[in-house]
Amino acid sequence: MEKNLPDIFFFPNCVNVFSYKYSQDEFSNMSKTERDSFSLAVFPVIKHRWHNAHVVKHKGIYKVSTEARGKKVSPPSLGKPAHINLTTKQYIYSEHTISFECYSFLKCITNTEINSFDEYILRGLLEAGNSLQIFSNSVGKRTDTIGVLGNKYPFSKIPLASLTPKAQREIFSAWISHRPVVLTGGTGVGKTSQVPKLLLWFNYLFGGFSTLDKITDFHERPVILSLPRIALVRLHSNTILKSLGFKVLDGSPISLRYGSIPEELINKQPKKYGIVFSTHKLSLTKLFSYGTLIIDEVHEHDQIGDIIIAVARKHHTKIDSMFLMTATLEDDRERLKVFLPNPAFIHIPGDTLFKISEVFIHNKINPSSRMAYIEEEKRNLVTAIQMYTPPDGSSGIVFVASVAQCHEYKSYLEKRLPYDMYIIHGKVLDIDEILEKVYSSPNVSIIISTPYLESSVTIRNVTHIYDMGRVFVPAPFGGSQEFISKSMRDQRKGRVGRVNPGTYVYFYDLSYMKSIQRIDSEFLHNYILYANKFNLTLPEDLFIIPTNLDILWRTKEYIDSFDISTETWNKLLSNYYMKMIEYAKLYVLSPILAEELDNFERTGELTSIVREAILSLNLRIKILNFKHKDDDTYIHFCKILFGVYNGTNATIYYHRPLTGYMNMISDTIFVPVDNN
């Protein structure tokens, strides 16, 4: 359906759009087109003001029960009013008087076309809309937004490009068309921080109706923003909660969903029209209970995120609207054009608020000489930080490929530079405490991080990025370092320039950048299991198709060998992490074992019961040879003897030299097999 968003329904960005109440005199002076804009108010008014309302008589005047208290009465007959009183906002007949709003309430019945609304109906919708605070104007003040969504505090002032009137119109037209939408925009235009808020607003106003051409029944469903990591769920939900004028979750339109969520982060009074911030895995468990689906960080190609895209595309009639958000389409545009049915592409132009300077530091060593390349890189990094130093009280981020490199580079830098050094990555538990130190320090802070800081945490005093240009790509029983893609470069560079001018220092040749096909280095069992659950046809229905389909079919055969029913698999998918697919054999044995194994997957606490159960699976690994690494570490070169990757070589670190065999407990725990 082609619909333009009238100006009066813009979301208040508190820059050039403000919450506003229109007077009847203003309405009288409007053009017909401007007056007709108020016809769309019937949808939010029906949902949020007239639902379960009735006619009452208050001091002799017919009103809606949401306007005044009074005894429920039968409605009067309505013809053309004899007189209009703009001051009291009443229509006067010879036998009775009725409020503008009550007149509209009685006239706006199911199947009425909104283009048939006359001036009398529109005046009543104006009054009802004023009471709901759903209108906006280019004049006003921030405090006028208090109460719009039940908020005690005003909306934030947002000058970002995604909330300009032009962007709001474009996003609304795409949303109401029910076409899949691919939304891109430079870092800093407000994709993740503002677009979900805008879609929440549209959902509050118009969500749940099958058409905006006539009055119909509605089915209210929330919006969901699906994200790859818990840190992002917490970060973005808190940002939007505050920007909508709330200080607590309860009673707000914001809810969170992720595994083992603490009690204080559960909204006990959620709104039916609200927005749920969820990890990808939990999004999949109730995907069709949401009206608008937003998938963020699409360029990361998180496995479950890609599966959600495939499921939503297969069952697109069960979702009102789908938005895919990504910083860049460099790697995915052509695939999305083919994969999605008639997609709409929206780009929000704009850069970061402040200028970002780029500096290239050349590494004279070829990357094929890995150790020499890294040693030269570390020397270059010290020189670069000395030449391009964050101001006192500010910070810089060093992007390296892995957790091990975080420690290696921190140790190297601490010996050569007089600055405060910190490490942040996904397994660091006290990130908030570290950031407090960074923000309160009068000194220069250098943060060494994995790609985690590309998006998971915004550091407000960062002025410099030092990018090594690499990422560790995990693979079954191993992984490798790769040079980053353009989208990853854009994300890293965009960490600065938001609050102050920034500097992006990069240490890699741009010709080394390449697209990363993550599915070719992943365990594929989730693709099989979710395909079974949602009736996907493999491989055609997958967003990204594996290069080697033999592995996909071998994975399917391996899963079939477990002899677990599809119904049971679906329950396991909804309730457990199953970081190793073989754990499924244990989850189905007994509820007590399932509870302990689940606790192990969540907390790392390995009880003797769980240990013995996993050992009984005989996840055997053969040790081929080993070499001494340092004082308490030996590198073992091994071969996997089970599963889809039987015969694959693996490297395992252990605190003493081993021979023979070991059993795998998890991806980090191995138990030597007793040779006796």
Swiss-Prot record:
Its EC number is 3.6.4.13. Monomer. InterPro entries: DEAD/DEAH_box_helicase_dom, DNA/RNA_helicase_DEAH_CS, Helicase_ATP-bd, Helicase_C-like, NPH-II, P-loop_NTPase. ATP binds at residues 185-192. Residues 366-535 form the Helicase C-terminal domain. It comes from Vaccinia virus (strain Copenhagen) (VACV). Residues 172-347 form the Helicase ATP-binding domain. GO terms for cellular component: virion component. It catalyses: ATP + H2O = ADP + phosphate + H(+). It comes from the Viruses. Keywords: ATP-binding, Early protein, Helicase, Hydrolase, Late protein, Nucleotide-binding, Transcription, Virion. Induction: Expressed both early and late in the viral replicative cycle. The keyword Transcription applies. NTP-dependent helicase that catalyzes unidirectional unwinding of 3'tailed duplex RNAs and plays an important role during transcription of early mRNAs, presumably by preventing R-loop formation behind the elongating RNA polymerase. Might also play a role in the export of newly synthesized mRNA chains out of the core into the cytoplasm. Required for replication and propagation of viral particles. A motif (DEXH box) lies at residues 296-299. One of its GO terms (molecular function) is RNA helicase activity. It is found in: Virion. Belongs to the DEAD box helicase family. DEAH subfamily. Gene3D superfamilies: P-loop containing nucleotide triphosphate hydrolases (3.40.50.300). SUPFAM superfamilies: P-loop containing nucleoside triphosphate hydrolases. This is RNA helicase NPH-II.
